[in-house]
Amino acid sequence: RCGLELGTQDVYVNVAGGASLSDPGADLGICLAVASSRLERPVSPGVAVCAEVGLGGELRPAGAFERRVREAHALGFPSMAGSAEDCSRAVEGGCLGFQTLCECIDGVLSPASHEGGRFP
């Protein structure tokens, strides 16, 4: 999805402390970490993320989203990227809503930091 061309890549995901991820809200963070590495573009500073990612690349609501936004703000993240549905209901400010993973990659990853990177 999103033109990342990962079919020829070995992708390993390591969770800090060896924890097990069972929260679907972590899907978006994992996907953005992989995209960030592949595209050599960091996540924009001050942005936390939370959404379930469907097999078609659609972003789905994550449980307790409003609580997650408040917690992210308390930890110093002024913005939270998530599903458009969650953000449309959010009372807290600084919510960036997206319909798809591709939209989120374009909206949340910083522009390439150097000319002539390895990937287009």
Each model region followed by its residue ranges:
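Peripheral, non-AAA+ core regions of ATP-driven protein-machinery
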Residues: 1-120
